[in-house]
């Protein structure tokens, strides 16, 4: 059975444990999703499911996508995601998926796009230490040296420098499911997940749980 679903980050909140400890939680709208394509090793070279989530107006869908989704017959979706899995042929096109693909206590990975912070310096982006701020110093927030000398004569790849902060695909691993409410398409997860409110996330069962 599939152990992944597309959803939407709703908001963060907190609940209180029996000992009074405040536990941070994230509410995720998990589904409903629809299977839009079943890929098999014989035809496609690998086994996977393509699932759709959300809705989109017909005027915002191009002709190739309309032709693809008209075969499903359940409207047009906001996003499509492909999930590799064994025995994908056990599912059918048009099948609906809900939050009950997960259970309370399961560990999951949540994949999303982090909040974009724009162009940022090394202090905000990487946590660099500031330079001296007194006695005529002029390098309070400068990054400092970026290389060596004649050798190697270049800036090494991966050097931490100013640039775009955030707006990147990120995976938060091994989060625990606190509650599952299939009738509300709701997952309650302990901890934070990447992205802003109403951001699209992919939830999958982790393979890193201890």
Swiss-Prot record:
- An annotated Gene Ontology molecular function: rRNA binding
Asked if the keyword rRNA-binding belongs to this entry, the reply reads: yes
Q: Which domain of life is it from?
A: Bacteria
Q: Which GO terms describe its cellular component?
A: cytosolic large ribosomal subunit
Q: Which Gene Ontology terms describe the biological processes this protein takes part in?
A: translation
Question: What does the UniProt function comment say about this protein?
Answer: One of the primary rRNA binding proteins, it binds directly near the 3'-end of the 23S rRNA, where it nucleates assembly of the 50S subunit.
Quaternary organization: Part of the 50S ribosomal subunit. Forms a cluster with proteins L14 and L19.
Enumerate the PANTHER family for this protein.
Answer: 50S RIBOSOMAL PROTEIN L3, LARGE RIBOSOMAL SUBUNIT PROTEIN UL3C
Q: What is this protein called?
A: Large ribosomal subunit protein uL3
């Amino acid at each position: 059975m599939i152990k992944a679903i597309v959803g939407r980050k709703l908001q963060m909140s907190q609940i209180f444990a029996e000992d009074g400890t405040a536990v941070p939680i994230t509410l995720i709208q998990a589904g409903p999703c629809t299977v839009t394509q079943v890929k098999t090793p014989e035809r496609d070279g690998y086994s996977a499911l393509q699932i759709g989530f959300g809705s989109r107006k017909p005027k915002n869908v191009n002709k190739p996508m309309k032709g693809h989704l008209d075969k499903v017959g359940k409207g047009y979706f906001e996003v499509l995601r492909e999930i590799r899995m064994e025995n994908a042929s056990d599912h059918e096109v048009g099948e609906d998926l809900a939050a009950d693909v997960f259970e309370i206590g399961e560990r999951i990975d949540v994949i999303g796009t982090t909040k974009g912070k724009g162009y940022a310096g090394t202090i905000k982006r990487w946590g660099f230490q500031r330079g001296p701020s007194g006695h005529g110093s002029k390098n309070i927030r400068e990054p400092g040296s970026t290389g060596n000398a004649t050798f190697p004569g270049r800036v090494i790849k991966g050097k931490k420098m100013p640039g775009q902060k955030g707006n990147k695909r990120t995976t938060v691993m091994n989060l625990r499911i606190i509650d599952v409410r299939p009738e509300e398409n709701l997952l309650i997860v302990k901890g934070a997940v990447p992205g802003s409110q109403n951001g699209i996330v992919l939830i999958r069962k982790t393979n890193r749980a201890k």
